[in-house]
Amino acid sequence: MSDSQDPTTSPVVTTQVELGGCSRQGGGNGFLRFRQHQEVQAFLSLLEDSFVQEFLSKDPCFQISDKYLLAMVLVYFQRAHLKLSEYTHSSLFLALYLANDMEEDLEGPKCEIFPWALGKDWCLRVGKFLHQRDKLWARMGFRAVVSRQCCEEVMAKEPFHWAWTRDRRPHHGGVQRVCPQVPVRLPRGPGLSPPHCSPCGLPQHCSSHLLKPVSSKCPSLTSECHRPPSQNYLSRVKNAWGGDFLIVLPPQMQLEPGTYSLRIFPKPPARPGH
């Protein structure tokens, strides 16, 4: 600045830096902070929508909508510079699907988004949905990577909101080889209960209470949340991937990762008269 320039008429220089994948504004612009506050509140209000609430309740294991994936949705909204009027069901499902694309290895669970986003004839509209996802991605400048630090900065703006209590359990994280005894038909869509999850101890009729933990009415220790006694046994099923067979353990038997020896005893001969 020259000595003759009046500092009161000089333009305010605003700097923008990337910290942990999140934009941070400098220069003391209060409007930007107010705008960010509006965006957070609009997003949290969208999560309170009854249709979104129902969708989230069908994901009791938080496989496609845990707290980090939800935080990524808000980051995507901000990177795409969505208007507040664009904070809609459609935008949420597009951004959530893109977040799953970026972070999740399994393809099956995220397909549950299709019937919620597209309705009854969703299978005829998947192509258009994926095109809209790509348009959102382009609108974001193809910046879909979000760091954990960035997600936690988003959560810190409203640290006590129930959405940030959606912690995924360890057995649903990491790389896993999935060998289901009975294939689960996905997606299920609105009006149907989510698949039963033995490790989480969440039967279908209990999952609807687990959206907001403070209102949970189905503790895991009650008899209603246990599997039927008839299923508490070792069972042998055909291995679709080759080999002899798979052993399916009852939910009460929790084994640490390692190598185990399996001893199979011959079936005792039938007694006479039986």
UniProtKB/Swiss-Prot annotation:
MF (Gene Ontology): protein kinase binding
Location relative to the cell: Cytoplasm
Expressed in which tissues: Expressed in a variety of tissues including bone marrow, kidney, small intestine, liver, placenta and testis.
Top-level taxon in the UniProt lineage: Eukaryota
Region (Speedy/Ringo box): 37-169
GO CC, alphabetical: cytoplasm; nucleus
Keywords: Cell cycle, Cytoplasm
Keyword Transport: no
Pfam families: Spy1 (PF11357)
Predominant place of localization: cytoplasm
Described function: Promotes progression through the cell cycle via binding and activation of CDK1 and CDK2. Involved in the spindle-assembly checkpoint. Required for recruitment of MAD2L1, BUBR1 and BUB1 to kinetochores. Required for the correct localization of the active form of Aurora B in prometaphase.
Entry text on domains: The C-terminus is required for CDK2-activation, but not CDK2-binding.
Family under the similarity heading: Belongs to the Speedy/Ringo family.
Subunit text: Interacts with CDK1 and CDK2. Interacts with AURKB.
Name this polypeptide is given: Speedy protein C
Organism: Homo sapiens
Lineage: Eukaryota, Metazoa, Chordata, Craniata, Vertebrata
